[in-house]
Amino acid sequence: MATARLSAMKPPRSCALIFLCAFSMATAPTNATAHRRAGTVKSTPPPEDKHSYTAKYYDKDIYFNIYEGRNSTPRRRTLSEIISKFSTSEMLSLKRVKAFVPVDENPTTTLEDIADILNYAVCDDNSCGCTIETQARIMFGDIIICVPLSADNKGVRNFKDRIMPKGLSQILSSSLGLHLSLLYGAFGSNYNSLAYMRRLKPLTAMTAIAFCPMTTKLELRQNYKVKETLCELIVSIEILKIRNNGGQTMKTLTSFAIVRKDNDGQDWETCTRFAPVNIEDILRYKRVANDTCCRHRDVQHGRRTLESSNSWTQTQYFEPWQDIVDVYVPINDTHCPNDSYVVFETLQGFEWCSRLNKNETKNYLSSVLGFRNALFETEELMETIAMRLASQILSMVGQQGTTIRDIDPAIVSALWHSLPENLTTTNIKYDIASPTHMAPALCTIFVQTGTSKQRFRNAGLLMVNNIFTVQGRYTTQNMFERKEYVYKHLGQALCQDGEILFQNEGQKFCRPLTDNRTIVYTMQDQVQKPLSVTWMDFNLVISDYGRDVINNLTKSAMLARKNGPRYLQMENGPRYLQMETFISDLFRHECYQDNYYVLDKKLQMFYPTTHSNELLFYPSEATLPSPWQEPPFSSPWPEPTFPSRWYWLLLNYTNY
């Protein structure tokens, strides 16, 4: 009956109007229709000429009637109202709605994006079943839509243009960055690897995988010189997609080849020897006055993160270098002899000394000032490769917003020198809850990454292989219908202040007492990491701009201490590099008001202490709050004190 009604009401295909379907607790027939307000368009059907009529579903004059159960009064909403006023909880209150407009709080999703989704987000009374040969089942939050894979579908073409670049960029950049982060002990932080987990949006990744061609290959070549040596950087990306009964798998192989083009390729490693940044360069701003007193070696003052029993390489807190503003060698100090010790000073004024000739100190010294720039540039390399790939696939080269700078061979060189010889593999698992109106199920994304290096007569080859497998699996534990929460044990009592409902092999099913959030993704237990941390040689990747950043920060910090805090407020005085300036310069983006929120979120992935309108380096606290501490919601960007905000973001990264 409902099917017949829908067939009778369905307008010509050319108008591309959307039917939003719902069903009640029993067998009551329901339907949903889209209308234009009276006076805008005649009530007659659109003209027969299919090319002369286009329905824009982001038009303010279009509204949707949603019928629920036996209620004959529809809920009328325009698309903009649906996006702005329909929260996820309000949508979920409909319970039996099969498919409706997905809400994406990410400001990069425009009304046009959602309009394209609406062009084919149509379900019938077959429980939103999707034909494998012609449609892909894609989940957006708690919504399942059936996406036709026909290349000549206008909605699919538009959707590909907007979603696919984002998805492939996240897949490639996140997987490479995730692999490096896990491989190198999360760059000295036991928690920072989870920031890379949050970088990959599984739902967007699933969409990109669904739209990705079955086979794709791209090769980029770039010539450069190291002194008088002629070299070439070759970046090759291959994508292979395999569909199976349980889901689909996408394999990406990213290869970096460094080739010497002269001298028959002899001594090709010369092409990887970029001028390093030595400690003397970083420490050239030395204090002339001896106003520092370090009582004795490795003693901290009022700060728990750097105790001798808990060195910075094994700290249990977030990024101990977060608020370092100055590093210098003391002069004529009996407690920290010259040329033997180095002094680290934080924004709060805390200081400590460490031996200059210790490898740990040298690594820390290089990282404390160069880590930020090196990490961003490495990430930008991954983003650049991914975006070049997406641009090639979608033929978007030359269009607005696709201009990409050349790949920095120094970063590839640093990757070559830092990665081990043998193949290493990491395995990560994302669990995504299925919509609550469907049978309780999990959709799982498995991510496997491996790295290998090969040496040839005239070149060195670095290969990073990523395998994404999307599978659907079912469980007898009806956790999702009861809004219970699944977490993995990551060294913290994640069920703190909550009730443990079920526990099996380290996996905990918890119901928080103070929270009603949707299910968060879980992470598979990782292989035990060695206690020693292998550091990338960031000296190889610090660019000239990075040196300027370091100099600016160091100079500003010194002048501020010399002249007082008011010096920073002077109109012509040096200031700490503010967040938007730092991001804008590194990513070559203009920071307008509408995308400030996006940049702020991107920064938070690596700078958990950064405040929206404060200095780049913000004071941190040394204790972890309860993971269930709820942040305020008075503004679009929560601003709880560190580290609760960062931890809250980690637990909620599905929303970003």
Curated annotation (Swiss-Prot):
This is Glycoprotein Q1. Its main location: virion. Plays a role in virus entry by participating in host receptor binding at the cell surface. Interacts with isoform gQ2. The heterodimer gQ1-gQ2 associates with the glycoprotein complex gH-gL to form a tetrameric complex. The gH/gL/gQ1/gQ2 complex binds to human receptor CD46. Glycans are attached at N290, N332, N338, N359, N422, N516, N552, N652. It is found in: Virion; Host endoplasmic reticulum lumen. GO terms for biological process: entry receptor-mediated virion attachment to host cell; symbiont entry into host cell. Residues 1-32 form the signal peptide.
